[in-house]
Amino acid sequence: MPSFDTPEPISVTAHVEAGSIQFTAGDGPATVVDVRPRDPKRDQDVRTAGQTGVTYAGGTLTVRTPKLGLLGRTGTVDVTVGLPVGSHAEVTGAWLQVFGEGRLGEVRVKTSSGDVRLDTTGPLKLTASHGSITVDRVEGAAEIATSSGSVRVGLVDGPAVLKNSHGTTSVEEARGDLRVSGANGDILIARAEGSVTATAANGTLRVAEVSRGTVQLETSYGAIEVGVREGTAAWLDVSSDSGQVRNTLSASKAPEESADTVKIRARTRFGNIDVRRARP
């Protein structure tokens, strides 16, 4: 079990062809790496674990499983990395699950298949072809994309771009401008402090609370629902080709210059549109 003295945050570059990698960020003065075969009785897993390289130099930890054999076979390993809070991580893999506990710094992940679950990160760039993605908190900008699977983000404290071809996408709170796009799947945003652009070919679009900026929502098949924060004036441009448009906001005079305003543009071909005050 390799261990390195690391009193300050470090950078990690890891490539795991198949298996999992878990980062645990803590206050300890050392970085500890453990590589284990997924199945201790499977020779390929044991061989891959034994051939996985772990090195540390110049503030960078490198973890790399061996290249695929001539027959394209590889073993499955589980890697754990205990490291200082605020450390950066760049992870790639084919069939790989990625987990993060504690507060990491900037994180970049690219996998072909596998779930990703992270507690807190700095700026985040995450790409997965297949797999569910869960991130509790992003302290900075976020770029997340998956071809198939759910995407759930707690708080994003910066601008964010989320792309999900097939699956539900949900955001609890976005403090910067937010762009979400999908082909098939609902888009659910609980609270947006900035502008929002959300588009889907087939899915419901719901933004529970907006307070300022521009909100642009468009879906071909699905309902649209927008909640406007109390005290915020709203300019509306909404239409449905086949469905009802319901606006329960009370008409008012032009807002004062100091008042928060939001411009809402919503379009759906098949589905209802509801605009109301946000529920407390």
Model regions: which residues?
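Intrinsically disordered, low-complexity terminal regions
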Residues: 1-280
